[in-house]
Amino acid sequence: VREMLPDVGEPLMLTLNKNVTCSRHKDGRNASDVSYIAFFGEYEGGELVVEEESGDRVLSERRVWHRFKGRDHFHYNLPHSGGTKYSIVAYSQNGNARRAAESAAHKDVC
C-alpha cells in the first residue's frame, strides 16, 4: 500500500468500511492533507462528493484509488442501494489520543 500511495504520510492508517454513508465533514485530525479512498462491491449510488474550490468533485469509479484532500475539503457520501458497498480509506493521523477522538467523531458523521 505504501508504494501505491507514497504521499499519504506517517503513520499510514487504513479503514475498511461496509455500507457506510458519512455526512458532510472534514478530517481535521489527519496529519496530512492527502487521503485516498477505493470503492468495492455491487451497488448503485454511494459516491463520495468532495467540495473543492473549483466545484464539487464526485468520486465513484470502483477498484481504483481516488486521491482527495479530506483534511482541507468538506466531503460526504451519497446514499447507496442494491447491494453491499465496501470502501477502504488511507490517511495519516496525529497521535494516539487524537486517534481515539477521531474514531469517536466519525461515529457522529458516518
Task: Please name every model-derived segment.
Residues 42-45, 49-110:
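Catalytic core of Fe(II)/2-oxoglutarate
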Residues 1-45:
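Conserved double-stranded beta-helix
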